[in-house]
């Protein structure tokens, strides 16, 4: 009887430890589309956000997004790192959001990464 109890306890502990293991999560592209509008900060000196519109594709989640940009947002031009100042209306970009988005229309969220696909 004791052996069965130990076996059950071992199985339960193994299940708990497996459930607590960190899984690697692949970052999901929130939206891929064209920058339609650029929002400036209150003082008008920096880009605070962009409006991106595209189509929902197999690897994207949204077709329209109001994207906030902060000092932690990383911008890439192709494979090289760019700057927020590289963003212009008409560019095609991919957005990876940082955390949850507000499920309004368009969705609203903070950009973790912006990748410029075309000039």
Positions of predicted regions on the chain:
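Beta-strand/loop nucleic-acid-binding surfaces
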Residues: 62-81
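Intrinsic disorder/low-structure terminal segments
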Residues: 14-16, 75, 96
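Sec-dependent bacterial lipoprotein signal peptides
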Residues: 1-18
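Short, flexible, surface-exposed loop segments at domain boundaries
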Residues: 2, 18-59, 80-119
């Amino acid at each position: 009887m004791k052996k069965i109890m130990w076996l059950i306890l071992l199985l339960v502990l193994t299940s708990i430890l497996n459930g607590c293991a960190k899984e690697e999560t692949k970052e999901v592209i929130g939206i891929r589309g064209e920058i339609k509008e650029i929002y400036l900060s209150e003082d008008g000196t920096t880009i605070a956000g962009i409006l991106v519109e595209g189509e929902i594709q197999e690897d994207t989640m949204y077709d329209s997004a109001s994207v906030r940009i902060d000092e932690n947002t990383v911008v890439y031009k192709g494979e090289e790192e760019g700057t927020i100042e590289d963003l212009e209306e008409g560019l095609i970009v991919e957005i990876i959001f940082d955390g949850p988005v507000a499920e309004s229309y368009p969705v609203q969220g903070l950009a973790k990464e912006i990748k410029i696909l075309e000039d």
